Amino acid sequence: MLVILRSVVLFVLAAVAEIGGAWLVWQGVREQRGLLWIGAGVIALGIYGFVATFQPDPNFGRILAAYGGVFVAGSLLWGVVVDGFRPDRWDLIGATICLAGVAVIMYAPR
């Protein structure tokens, strides 16, 4: 159970780093907030690259495939919290399907 908890925490940290980093770059470029925002985004994206290496599963492909589902759900949540985005039912259904896929890929008994 602790291994699963560790894995979930690492997925959340990875999502914050990647989504936050991409959002900072977006703000720097699209919203013309400047190079400091872009630089902070690049650093956050670099941190994301390291976080996945701490996952307990040794398979890069499995971790990144599962993280894709976390990214989908996390991006929608980021939009709600940070940008005032309101997902519709299809967004929520899609995110739920993605998270179910994460659970199967990462935590199914092998």
Swiss-Prot record:
Coiled-coil blocks: none
Keywords associated with the record: Cell membrane, Membrane, Transmembrane, Transmembrane helix
Sequence intervals crossing the membrane: 8-28, 34-54, 63-83, 89-109
Protein's cellular compartments: Cell membrane
Superkingdom in the source lineage: Bacteria
UniProt topology in membrane: Multi-pass membrane protein
Pfam families associated with the record: UPF0060
One of the record's GO cellular component terms: plasma membrane
Disulfide bonds: none
InterPro entries: UPF0060
HAMAP family documented for this protein: UPF0060 (MF_00010)
Similarity annotation: Belongs to the UPF0060 family.
Stated name of the protein: UPF0060 membrane protein SACE_5620
